[in-house]
């Protein structure tokens, strides 16, 4: 199988199933964390098989917002986006709004993606977007995560919402 087939046909469905089992209290936090760690290793191995000599399509920056330590979704999106030829500046998880702004000034990405898994961190996402909007020449901002929707993205003044990794690739293909 090709790396993208492994990601789309095996890893993403397995992570989705682990999340569902966790929500049903059939899988517990240690097992969920083990799934996350295993998937990170698998993604790292698969990343080695992507064409590194392909022309770069653009530079994007991604972060999981302050207060949120769940970055599995962001990491999946990152690997898929990189596999399509984009360079991703990954700021990590639990990233303060001010740090996202500083990174924007330093790296000048063509788009910024923000992720949140918990409703309690949505105010952090809103603050991050508000501070980014104060920057001259701000690039498009997209948001994603289990607790987000198209409506909420509009409410917090994000330019775009993406539901999954392939939707993110489709968006980047359109806007960059």
Regions picked out by a protein language model, each given a short descriptive name:
Residues 1-176:
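Domain-level signal for soluble alpha/beta catalytic cores
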């Amino acid at each position: 199988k090709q790396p993208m087939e492994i990601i789309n046909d095996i890893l993403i469905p397995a992570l989705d199933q682990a999340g569902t089992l966790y929500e049903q209290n059939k899988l517990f936090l240690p097992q969920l964390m083990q799934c996350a760690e295993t998937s990170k290793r698998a993604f790292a191995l698969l990343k080695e098989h992507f064409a590194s000599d392909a022309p770069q399509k653009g530079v994007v920056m991604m972060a999981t917002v302050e207060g949120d330590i769940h970055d599995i979704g962001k990491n999946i999106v990152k690997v898929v986006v990189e596999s399509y030829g984009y360079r991703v500046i990954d700021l990590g998880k639990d990233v303060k709004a001010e740090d996202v702004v500083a990174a924007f000034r330093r790296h000048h990405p063509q788009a910024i993606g923000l992720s949140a898994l918990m409703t309690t961190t949505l105010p952090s996402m809103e603050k991050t977007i508000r501070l980014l909007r104060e920057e001259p020449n701000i690039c498009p901002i997209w948001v994603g995560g289990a607790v987000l929707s198209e409506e909420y993205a509009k409410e917090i003044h994000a330019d775009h919402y993406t539901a999954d990794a392939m939707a993110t690739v489709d968006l980047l293909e359109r806007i960059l």
